Amino acid sequence: MSHVPSLSYREIIHALQHDGWIVIRQRGSYIRLQKHVGNRTMKLTVPAHRPVKRSTLSQILKQAELELNKFLKLL
């Protein structure tokens, strides 16, 4: 398994949008995204930081139910 890279929030959001996530709002330095999966709605918060910490990105991927390899292909 690869190591989680250090990326900017714009790169992360761009990849998540390719996976079907939609930006619903931004408040301050936090961006909210959501995705409808079946009969449930998943929500994420991505901090608008450059770069986003690798541990934070790891938690975002867990919440998004995305594996690192698939995420890296979306970049």
Segments from the language model and where they lie:
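C-terminal structural segments of small proteins and small subunits
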Residues: 49-75
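N-terminal first-folded block
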Residues: 1-27, 35-38
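A short, structured beta-strand/loop element
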Residues: 23-59
